Amino acid sequence: AVDAGAKVIHLLADLHGRGADGSFVSDLFKEAHMILIEQGRRETVTLFGGGGIVGADHVPKAIISGLDAAALDLPVLFAFQGRSHGSLRKRDKVSGTLPRRMDHDWAEQRLANLCGSWRDQLLEILGAMGIRDVRRLRGEFGRSMIVRHLEDEAFEGIAGYAGGGA
């Protein structure tokens, strides 16, 4: 896509945060980020990603994994008190419905509240890391704490621990 002149690439996982091969979304984002770095093209392409991003803490994790921006789909639907229907495993099998009578001003305020609270969470995490600009967070893998890695480090060598990605 980059060879064809794409300036934005939208990476999409299922709504549980899994790629087509079952890989977790943060691994997929990191892989795309690293490929672009290896090609010397990272600064020419915007990585936009979605899938499994449902909590305020998921946005900074997605950015640490290499994204420039995160797509929000289900959180917006639910902020409007909408309902999802179908399988969340397959994007083409899920749909959403909004309340029949939704006041425009109310919906606008709900979206502002959602974005504001997620912004506050991002600023809190940036502050805790001593970072003032969200762009500095992109691809900072060394700052991330991945549960799988932490468990392996803590429990490796203990009889009965099934870790190691098992």
Regions found by a protein language model. Give the residues of each.
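Glycine-rich phosphate/ribose-binding loops and adjacent secondary-structure elements
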Residues: A1-E108
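C-terminal extensions of enzymes
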Residues: W106-A166
